[in-house]
Amino acid sequence: MMLGVYTLLLLWGLATPCLGLLETVGTLARIDKDELGKAIQNSLVGGPILQNVLGTVTSVNQGLLGAGGLLGGGGLLSYGGIFSLVEELSGLKIEELTLPKVSLKLLPGVGVQLNLHTKVSLHGSGPLVGLLQLAAEVNVSSKVALGMSPRGTPILVLKRCSTLLGHISLMSGLLPTPIFGLVEQTLCKVLPGLLCPVVDSVLSVVNELLGATLSLVPLGPLGSVEFTLATLPLISNQYIELDINPIVKSIAGDVIDFPKPRIPVKVPPKEDHTSQVTVPLYLFSTVFGLLQTNGALDLDITPEMVPRNVPLTTTDLAALAPEALGKLPPAQHLLLSLRVTKSPMVLLQNKKATVSIPVTIHVLSSVPQGTPVALFQLNGVMTLNAHLAPSSTKLHISLSLERLSVQLASSFPQPFDASRLEEWLSDVVRAAYMQRLNEHLEVGIPLPKILNVNFANSVVDIIENAVVLTVAP
């Protein structure tokens, strides 16, 4: 079966993407042309777009050439018209529209040329011609401009739709040559006009997907992230680039403005046939900053929270630093109060993600039926390794303790070398603190919806001050 062509020129942008620099703190999305083509193809397969075309002229006696059409109501071929001998031909209607095959080409600085290859089958009947079947090839050329919706989302607007009907074949039935020529001429004027709504419907589906890119994503008890478009889309010969600005808000609705990196992110080149999302350091810092502000990083550790092989008594502490206990008796339970009063620092570089959390540790002795006795206070830094795992909607973070360094801030009995406690404290933190911290991090780093691209199986690349997710269509 020969294929026709829909050609759709999307005037998406008049500039090309910058040379790998993300000047803002935004999320940079690069949509490969294959993803755009797949979105359009899926809109034709899964939706009612093609069925709506079939429903345009399907009534038996109200078809294109039926009553009220070209043969009825004073139509060109109606009784008394030029060719009254076919006055009883009726019900010519679209029975089948071949699923278009989508191909497109990105034109840097111009737009996108989209080709939809299809063929239309029409059926009809009449006493002189019997059962009639026609096949028509179609070439619809449309121009679409990029505008902004009232919500501030990118939207494609159909500006002009011109059509060219290709070869028409008589598959079955009989039509005298003069009549066939007139039918062909009439179809050239009428039939392609019925197919312009296909272009409009495709644009509507794509616009819905583009609109979903800019959305409000909840961050659990921390707040939310609103994705907005920072600039108009840019276009290269392989991808469309969206500079998306993430606006983080607290649970009360206040905009959170944490420090941003001064040096632009150098985004690596995108490989062909892949789509890419760059998640900036700003989002990581903001999530950890919200955790600190909400007190989620603070924890009081009691003996019940650690396994038996992790000691948390004055006896065990005396073996490490006896001078820290003074005159306290052995075998008393210890309490550790961890407080984080400053925002953690997230470091993304050299394919590694680390988080440094400044912490104050108050060590107390639990007195039965009494007020805990403060022993000493430590100032420390927890250095954590971050493991990043993408899903379809977010970038998940899980932390593990690499090291804990402490120094004595104040001591009631007498000063001592606090470094002797680091291994013991590290065991306590791993047993009680890390699980609680990772539970709070289940909110993850939200990802914008990019034409339904699934980043669950994406390749994660940690670069300077950003994380790049790359996925093949």
From Swiss-Prot:
According to the record, glycans are attached at N139
Highest taxon listed in the record's lineage: Eukaryota
The record's section on InterPro entries has: Bactericidal_perm-incr_a/b_dom, BPI_fold-BPI/LBP, Lipid-bd_serum_glycop_C, Lipid-bd_serum_glycop_N
The signal sequence is 1-20
Q: Which UniProt keywords apply?
A: Disulfide bond, Glycoprotein, Secreted, Signal
MF-aspect GO terms = lipid binding
Q: List the disulfide bonds.
A: C161-C196
Question: Which protein is depicted?
Answer: BPI fold-containing family B member 3
